[in-house]
C-alpha cells in the first residue's frame, strides 16, 4: 500500500530508535471516523542453529500497518490511503506502557460510546509493575 506516512507531533516519523512501540490514531479524512490502537516496533523470533535455540529481534511491519480493525482496513482499500491521517500519539519504551496508554486513550476518548470510531473492543491486562512512564 504505502511505505510510511506516520507522523509524530506533526513531523514525519521514520526511525523507532530505542522505543518498543507506539499508540496511534488513524483518521478517515472524508468521514472523520477514527481509530485508536497500538503497534510494537519489534518482535522476538526464535531460530534453532546447531541444536541451540537463539532469540533475535526483528522489526515489525509498523510502516505499512493499518490497524486490526477490518472496517478500517476495508475503507483504506475502498477509498485509498491518501484519505487517511496516521498519527503517533505516544512513543513507549516497553510493552506494558504501550498497552496501558492504548487503553487509557480509548477510555478517555470514549471510543465505544459513539459511531465516530472504528474501535469495537477495548482489551487490556496490565500490572502496575509493567507500567513505566
Question: Which positions does each model-derived feature cover?
Answer:
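Structure-specific nucleic-acid interaction/processing domains
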Residues: 1-133
Amino acid at each position: 500500500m504505502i511505505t510510511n506516512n506516520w507522523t509524530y507531533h506533526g513531523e514525519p516519523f521514520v526511525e523507532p530508535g530505542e522505543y518498543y512501540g507506539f499508540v496511534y490514531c488513524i483518521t478517515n479524512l472524508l468521514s472523520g471516523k477514527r481509530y485508536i490502537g497500538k503497534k510494537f516496533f519489534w518482535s522476538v523470533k526464535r531460530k534453532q542453529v546447531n541444536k541451540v535455540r537463539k532469540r533475535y529481534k526483528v522489526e515489525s511491519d509498523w510502516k505499512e500497518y493499518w490497524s486490526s480493525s477490518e472496517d478500517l482496513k476495508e475503507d483504506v482499500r475502498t477509498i485509498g490511503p491518501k484519505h487517511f491521517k496516521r498519527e503517533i500519539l505516544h512513543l513507549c519504551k516497553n510493552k506494558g506502557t504501550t498497552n496501558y496508554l492504548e487503553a487509557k486513550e480509548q477510555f478517555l476518548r470514549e471510543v465505544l460510546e459513539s459511531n465516530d470510531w472504528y474501535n469495537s473492543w477495548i482489551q487490556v491486562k496490565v500490572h502496575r509493575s509493567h507500567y513505566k512512564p
